[in-house]
A protein has these predicted regions:
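Non-catalytic, mobile gating and regulatory segments of ester bond hydrolases
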Residues: 1-175, 179-298
């Protein structure tokens, strides 16, 4: 009798948990997350639009005859492109990228494109991670993204060192979007740890702009590298809020409804304090800038 009486109660609790999870994930406006943050200055945010255009240019096959240029173009000089690597050249170890010597803005930029939905190698990089699998500088990082970051750094560190030494007043900037944002964040951290390989460049000359990055570093590393890495999140962008442990979702695609139910119950019943205390949990890297452009239902 007690079991039968308990069934409706359990169902109600379950439904309330699912409703709360749905509210948080789908209806709760992201503007509330940053409503108490300070406003960014124009000087802080100035590089972002320019670097976004530069990242977009990596998608082009021929920068002299672009096919998908935004209004006003990419704002770059094709003659200042030092190298531009394709999937064939990276061998699937990383997404395509470009090194650009920006004389107008006194900047050496390594820009990496985002996830290519048609490339299996990109998924392999993103899904190559387990909770607490890889340690770095006293914290935890995403295993697949770190391997891609090390591959690019090792491949281009001599070229970057030459550019830094030939242009001692230029900053070294890493910029990327989505999957590429996670990779450049870890490249920046790896570069800070190996500045001797870049001609002993000062830490203050290294910076990173990660547009909609994947969660790739533990909380202590996100804070420690906040002076180097800047993460830009647009409105309700899901990637910086979504765990990178997606292997189970892809492996269980045929029982996705059951998996989502388990996820919402676990998310509802786990205290935020407990999540924050887990040193292995990954977060968006560095200092966060949140762009809020609209309100819900408006």
């Amino acid at each position: 009798m007690s079991i039968l009486c308990g069934v409706p109660i359990l169902e109600c609790v379950y439904c309330l948990g699912c409703a709360r999870w749905l509210w948080q994930k789908c209806l709760y406006t992201a503007g509330h997350e940053s409503e108490n943050w300070g406003l960014a200055t124009a000087e802080e945010f100035e590089p972002v639009p320019r670097l976004c255009r530069l990242i977009l240019s990596v998608y082009e096959d021929d920068l002299r005859y672009p096919l998908w240029a935004p209004p006003g173009g990419y704002g770059i000089n094709p003659d200042w492109v030092i190298v531009k690597r394709t999937y064939e050249e990276t061998g699937g170890c990383a997404t395509p990228y470009m090194i650009y010597l920006d004389h107008d803005n006194v900047d050496i930029v390594l820009a990496i494109r985002g996830l290519n939905l048609a490339k299996e190698s990109d998924y392999a990089v993103l899904l190559d991670n387990k909770l607490g699998q890889t340690k770095f500088d006293g914290g935890y990082v995403h295993n697949g993204l770190l391997k891609a970051a090390k591959w690019i750094f090792d491949a281009e560190c001599e070229l970057l060192r030459d550019l830094v030494e030939m242009n001692p007043d230029y900053r070294l900037t890493f910029a990327g979007h989505s999957l590429g944002a996670g990779i450049v964040s870890l490249i920046a951290m790896y570069a800070v740890q190996n500045r001797d390989k870049l001609g002993t460049i000062e830490r203050k000359r290294i910076r990173c702009f990660a547009m909609a990055p994947a969660r790739c570093v533990s909380l202590n590393l996100a804070v420690r590298y906040a002076d180097v890495i800047n993460s830009i999140v647009l409105q309700d962008d899901f990637l910086p809020r979504t765990t990178t442990a997606l292997e189970d979702v892809y492996k269980s695609i045929f029982c996705l409804p059951c998996l989502l139910c388990l996820m919402c119950v676990k998310d509802t019943c786990t205290l935020e304090e407990k999540k924050l205390k887990d040193p292995r949990r990954l977060y968006a890297p560095g200092r966060l800038y949140h762009i809020v452009e609209r309100k819900p239902f408006r």
